[in-house]
């Protein structure tokens, strides 16, 4: 019966560290994936012909 109490005590001390490490690794991996996607999209925008014209609004001509 003493072995079960030792395993329960170990697991109760182990799980908060495990969840903390798991959260940190998931956040770091998501940041890495998002930065890679941003870099790929920037490279694709460099090869786009209409990249410089996307944010320009058409100007209306005023007839005088």
From Swiss-Prot:
Protein location: Virion membrane; Host cell membrane; Host Golgi apparatus membrane; Host endoplasmic reticulum membrane
One Gene Ontology biological process: symbiont-mediated activation of host apoptosis
Keywords: Activation of host caspases by virus, Glycoprotein, Host cell membrane, Host endoplasmic reticulum, Host Golgi apparatus, Host membrane, Host-virus interaction, Ion channel, Ion transport, Membrane, Modulation of host cell apoptosis by virus, Phosphoprotein, Signal-anchor, Transmembrane, Transmembrane helix, Transport, Viral ion channel, Virion
One annotated Gene Ontology cellular component of this protein: virion membrane
Activity regulation as described: Channel activity is inhibited by copper. Also inhibited by small-molecule pyronin B.
Topological domains, Intravirion: 1-20
Effect upon mutating residue 22 to F: Impairs channel activity. Reduces the effect of small-molecule inhibitor
Region described as Interaction with host BCAP31: 6-15
Domain of life of the native organism: Viruses
Molecular function per GO: identical protein binding; monoatomic cation channel activity
Primary location group: virion
Binding partners and assembly: Homopentamer forming a funnel-like pore. Interacts with glycoprotein G; this interaction occurs on the surface of virion particles and infected cells. Interacts with host BCAP31 (via C-terminus); this interaction is direct.
Protein's recorded name: Small hydrophobic protein
Origin species: Human respiratory syncytial virus A (strain A2)
């Amino acid at each position: 019966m003493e072995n079960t109490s030792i395993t329960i005590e170990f697991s109760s001390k182990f799980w908060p560290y495990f969840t903390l490490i798991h959260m940190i690794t998931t956040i770091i991996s998501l940041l890495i994936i998002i930065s890679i996607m941003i870099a790929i999209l920037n490279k694709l925008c460099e090869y786009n012909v209409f990249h410089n014209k996307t944010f320009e609004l058409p100007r209306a001509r005023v007839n005088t």
